[in-house]
Swiss-Prot record:
Pfam families: WRKY. It comes from Arabidopsis thaliana. Its main location: nucleus. Residues 266-278 have a biased composition (Low complexity). SUPFAM superfamilies: WRKY DNA-binding domain (SSF118290). Residues 107-175 bind DNA. Transcription factor. Interacts specifically with the W box (5'-(T)TGAC[CT]-3'), a frequently occurring elicitor-responsive cis-acting element. It is found in: Nucleus. Residues 65-92, 266-291 are annotated as: Disordered. This is Probable WRKY transcription factor 30.
Length: 303
């Protein structure tokens, strides 16, 4: 009975990932022809969300497989079962940081308007730091299940700078109305503004290799788990082909990766025409994605 239940869950996950890959491919097509900075930022965020949701489902698939292999009493077909709830683990959530300059005498809470609604749920003193750290979560965490959080702390070196650490992407209704995850204010007069969600579009290949090691160790049985072995190429191609578009701020995850990207922001004279998105075609891995390819084991997605 347990095996039949697991097969049904695998099939559901396969369909969800298939839809996310098609969605990401469509956004990538639009990104290649987008002419404005604002549109590219919005599409980049959508592409990232497709990646993040796919990884979240696959991370959950490993946990589900471990539970099913761990034994336990079998359930009858007519027994009441809780609906499948897929929740992101902290290790799978993207994380990035920013420094924002504030006006002299301004309060911390009044200068944190980044387009999203946050609720402060805690504050504590940090050992060795001059200023306390504030903890915020999305206002819609309970009503819509949004897991986005951030931490805010004044810089010890410069009281006019706020160090902000973000974790997770907004999945609430706010995300559709806000074009970027956070505004990064200029720290230098001639510095071009860059937005945090663009810094996150690329994941380090080491991240996927680490995930592959974890998933392969689970030894999925082919009879009960779908295979995404062909999809790894899409992740790696996105990283290799588009790395020139993004960067100069760092992105890191709890898996231990930290990488830099170079994004040629519009209006910056320091970037040559050869680096401009208008002259360099975007070849997205989503373009070659086949939604009808065969499936086998989830571990193959990272192999």
């Amino acid at each position: 009975m347990e095996k039949n239940h697991s097969s049904g869950e695998w099939e559901k996950m396969k369909n969800e990932i298939n839809e996310l890959m098609i969605e990401g491919r469509d956004y990538a097509h639009q990104f290649g022809s987008a002419s404005s900075q604002e549109t590219r930022e919005h599409l980049a965020k959508k592409i990232l969300q497709s990646y993040h949701k796919s990884l979240t489902i696959m991370n959950y698939s490993g946990e589900l497989d471990q539970v099913s292999q761990g034994g336990g009493s079998p359930k009858s077909d007519d027994s009441d079962q809780e609906p499948l709830v897929i929740k992101s683990s902290k290790k799978s959530m993207p994380r990035w940081s920013s420094k924002v300059r504030i006006a002299p005498g301004a309060g911390v809470d009044r200068t944190l308007d980044d387009g999203f609604s946050w609720r402060k749920y805690g504050q504590k003193d940090i050992l060795g730091a001059k200023f306390p750290r504030g903890y915020y979560r999305c206002t819609y965490r309970k009503s819509q299940g949004c897991e986005a959080t951030k931490q805010v702390q004044r810089s010890d070196e410069n009281q006019m700078l706020l160090e902000i650490s973000y974790r997770g992407i907004h999945s609430c209704s706010q995300a559709a109305n806000v074009g970027t995850t956070m505004p990064i204010q200029n720290l230098e007069p001639n510095q071009t503004q860059e937005h945090g969600n663009l810094d996150m579009v690329k994941e380090s290949v080491d991240n996927y290799n680490h995930q592959a090691h974890l998933h392969h160790n689970l030894h999925y049985p082919l009879s009960s788990t779908p295979n995404l072995e062909n999809n790894n190429a899409y992740m790696l191609q996105m990283r290799d082909q588009n790395i020139e578009y993004f960067g100069s701020t760092s992105f890191s995850s709890d898996l231990g990766t930290s990488i830099n990207y170079n994004f040629p922001a519009s209006g910056s004279a320091s970037h040559s025409a050869s680096n401009s998105p208008s002259t360099v075609p975007l070849e997205s891995p989503f373009e070659s994605y086949d939604p009808n390819h065969p499936y086998g084991g989830f571990g193959g997605f990272y192999s």
